[in-house]
Amino acid sequence: MGKISQSVSLGYLTRRIARKANIPFEEAPVGFKFIAEKLLHEGAAFAAEESGGYAWKGNQPESDGLVTFLLIAEMLINEKKNLSSLVANLEKEYGKTCFLRRDIALPKVMPNKHSFAVKVKKKLPKTMLGHKIAETETIDGLKIILENDWWLLMRPSGTELMMRAYAETDSSAETEKMLDLACKLAAVK
């Protein structure tokens, strides 16, 4: 089968599905070139990125919306269900998910994402929104993963006076709160 690979900024529904199916899962830096590398040289069967780019083993290592559409159409026909029913089934089995991104103005350019991540990591609380921090990753900025699979990713631009913050929880209200925390954490000197 192969593993599932996705950009670090993409939501965790894919991760939860892979976990339940015992399929290896990994993340890569933001940018299709990084997940294409996983398809070409590292045994990925499927790769995805936040902007809707999906690629499949055995095809071109490029974002392929047509193949993705055809696979979804085949699934709809085989399951004899409409798309909203399939989405409802996914939510029932794997939980609701709300993913949002926010661009946050910074007072100065932060060309080194890793040093930013190290500084913020030192100041992290033990819990966020009432949930323990389970792990942190520094693949591309700083990703904070909570014990319940909620997460926050902070990626300074490196060339602009801004940081992209991405978050996923089970509701829009909680996701907005997570992005508000990113604003506070980004103020760390």
Residue ranges and their predicted role:
Residues M1-K189:
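Phosphate-binding and adjacent anionic-ligand microenvironments
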